[in-house]
UniProtKB/Swiss-Prot annotation:
One CC-aspect GO term: cytoplasm
Region (G5): 174-176
PROSITE patterns: G_TR_1, G_TR_2
Role summary: GTP hydrolase that promotes the GTP-dependent binding of aminoacyl-tRNA to the A-site of ribosomes during protein biosynthesis.
Organism the protein comes from: Gloeobacter violaceus (strain ATCC 29082 / PCC 7421)
Protein name (Swiss-Prot/TrEMBL): Elongation factor Tu
Length: 409
């Protein structure tokens, strides 16, 4: 029993493998689990177990994702790996698997390829804060100078998309060689095989370079309003789930979105029909608001720490449009298209003003199955921030998913 408790005391970090198809993301994921399993810090997973990823739904979109977990001496990791390129795009945009950092896998034999670039761009757009690089398939290179060239290319590519290319740790090795060695000697530890040691070096780099994320509870308070009702003689109660931070009775908070920002005081907090002094991130709670009428509050507004979030009507977003097979639209759409944008707890009508491809070229139209960057104008101001996820809906069905990459107005 004591062991389970010990594991919980390690800081938890979410990471994932990204990179071009067939560069070795899944092989590396398997190699990490096999290597750390020798120390009792992971459950060894074979390539096939990870590759046959189960389907999940996130924001109405089906995504195949494999989740593995493992520990290093310092941390507990949840690691996500996707079998197909489209799954990566959907995963990163919906935030189905939020990543605090990513391991970019690049085949040293091939160098950066189109999806390498696309995944780096996506990581930048959706707010994956840190990247560590694994140059894979080193066993296929005879010339060490080639390895240096590939490393240089990768650093330039990272810098191009505003990652600190010169500082990013790059570890070279062979996931397949390490995996085969661990399969033949499951108890092999560090210092006995060069290929296996590369996996340890990679995990050292991840431990050191990817910072422990700020916990939700330490961030400024925010709760999206799901429902509102009045209690005779006591006032108005807004209910919802606290997204981050904490709130205490007697604190001043702001009501943000839809109709301008108002300040109010928390006069009471209730959970499961019991009153409490403090609500924490993750709690489903009722917040009693002083001097606020029921008609002043509606679903889609947020309660937040004063000054921590502001309402906006215009933003840029990175968006994936569902294909017909996924239950999306059957026809393309053009600039001026007006769907609903589902933000936190509510639908808001908005106009898609313009859209561009990765190169910044204006596109004529958007086809089902496309990934696109778009500028959106909402009819009502809503509390929006960078990195926030949203769904695009039409008549109640999801036709796309997106993430705010830049606030404009």
């Amino acid at each position: 029993m004591a062991r389970a408790k010990f594991e919980r005391n390690k800081p938890h970090v979410n990471i994932g493998t990204i990179g071009h198809v067939d560069h070795g993301k899944t092989t590396l994921t398997a190699a990490i689990t096999m290597t750390l399993a020798a120390l009792g810090r992971a459950k060894a997973k074979k390539y096939d177990e990870i590759d046959q990823a189960p389907e999940e739904k996130a924001r109405g979109i089906t995504i195949n994702t494999a989740h593995v977990e493992y520990e290093t001496e310092k941390r507990h990791y949840a690691h996500v790996d996707c079998p197909g390129h489209a799954d990566y795009v959907k995963n990163m945009i919906t935030g189905a698997a939020q990543m605090d950092g990513a391991i970019l896998v690049v085949s040293a034999a091939d160098g950066p390829m189109p999806q390498t670039r696309e995944h780096i761009l996506l990581a930048r757009q959706v707010g994956v804060p840190n990247i560590v690089v694994f140059l894979n398939k080193k066993d296929q290179l005879d010339d060490p100078e080639l390895l240096e060239l590939v490393e240089l290319e990768v650093r330039e590519l990272l810098s191009k998309y505003d990652f600190p290319g010169d500082d990013v740790p790059i570890v070279a090795g062979s996931a397949l060689m390490a995996l085969e060695k661990m399969a033949s000697e499951p108890k092999l530890i560090r210092g006995k095989d060069d290929w296996v040691d590369c996996i340890y070096s990679l995990m050292d780099a991840v431990d050191a370079y990817i910072p422990t994320p700020e916990r939700a509870i330490d961030k400024p308070f925010l709760m999206a309003v799901e429902d509102v009702f009045s209690i005779t003689g006591r006032g108005t109660v807004a209910t919802g789930r606290i997204e981050r931070g904490k709130v205490k009775v007697g604190e001043t908070i702001e009501l943000v979105g839809i109709r301008g920002t108002r300040s109010t005081t928390v006069t009471g907090l209730e959970m499961f029909q019991k009153s409490l002094d403090e609500g924490l991130a993750g709690d489903n709670i009722g917040v009693l608001l002083r001097g606020i009428k029921k008609e002043d509050v509606e679903r889609g507004m947020v309660l937040a720490k004063p000054g921590s979030i502001t309402p906006h009507t215009q933003f840029e977003g990175e968006v994936y449009i569902l294909s017909k097979e996924e239950g999306g639209r059957h026809t393309p759409f053009f600039a001026g298209y007006r769907p609903q944008f589902y933000v936190r707890t509510t639908d808001v009508t908005g106009t898609i003003v313009t859209f561009t491809d990765d190169e910044g070229k204006s596109a004529e139209m958007v086809m089902p199955g496309d990934r696109i960057k778009m500028t959106v104008e909402l009819i009502n101001p809503i509390a929006i921030e960078d990195g926030m996820r949203f769904a695009i809906r039409e008549g109640g069905r999801t036709v796309g998913a997106g993430v705010v990459s830049k606030i404009l107005k």
